[in-house]
Amino acid sequence: MAKSAYQILRKPVITEKGLGVKETESTLVFEVSANATKTEIKEAVQKTFKVKVDTVRTANFVGKERRRGKFSGYRPDWKKAYVRLKTGEKMPEYAENL
């Protein structure tokens, strides 16, 4: 069963580094589904924002241990995707307002 674009793209990651690469490299940063592939991420961004994608880079993050008194647990593992747009492509409207 194919996943929808909204199941693959969880939310944009808005950090200083993310805003920096947005300006200099025309790259968008997203938190994505942990089992999403680069081609699925590329197709989801192209379908959702109607832009052409050049490359996709991903990074996996292991959840950190968190404690509440004597109880301990772990944050969930997650994946981040850096999506570079092709030259000449306009940034999506949500990214221009950041």
UniProtKB/Swiss-Prot annotation:
<dbReference type="GO" id="GO:0006412">
    <property type="term" value="P:translation"/>
</dbReference>
<comment type="similarity">
    <text>Belongs to the universal ribosomal protein uL23 family.</text>
</comment>
<keyword id="KW-0694">RNA-binding</keyword>
<comment type="function">
    <text>One of the early assembly proteins it binds 23S rRNA. One of the proteins that surrounds the polypeptide exit tunnel on the outside of the ribosome. Forms the main docking site for trigger factor binding to the ribosome.</text>
</comment>
<dbReference type="Pfam" id="PF00276">
    <property type="entry name" value="Ribosomal_L23"/>
</dbReference>
<keyword id="KW-0687">Ribonucleoprotein</keyword>
<comment type="subunit">
    <text>Part of the 50S ribosomal subunit. Contacts protein L29, and trigger factor when it is bound to the ribosome.</text>
</comment>
<dbReference type="GO" id="GO:0005840">
    <property type="term" value="C:ribosome"/>
</dbReference>
<dbReference type="GO" id="GO:0019843">
    <property type="term" value="F:rRNA binding"/>
</dbReference>
<dbReference type="InterPro" id="IPR012678">
    <property type="entry name" value="Ribosomal_uL23/eL15/eS24_sf"/>
</dbReference>
<dbReference type="GO" id="GO:0003735">
    <property type="term" value="F:structural constituent of ribosome"/>
</dbReference>
<keyword id="KW-0689">Ribosomal protein</keyword>
<dbReference type="InterPro" id="IPR012677">
    <property type="entry name" value="Nucleotide-bd_a/b_plait_sf"/>
</dbReference>
<protein>
    <recommendedName>
        <fullName>Large ribosomal subunit protein uL23</fullName>
    </recommendedName>
</protein>
<dbReference type="InterPro" id="IPR013025">
    <property type="entry name" value="Ribosomal_uL23-like"/>
</dbReference>
<dbReference type="GO" id="GO:1990904">
    <property type="term" value="C:ribonucleoprotein complex"/>
</dbReference>
<keyword id="KW-0699">rRNA-binding</keyword>
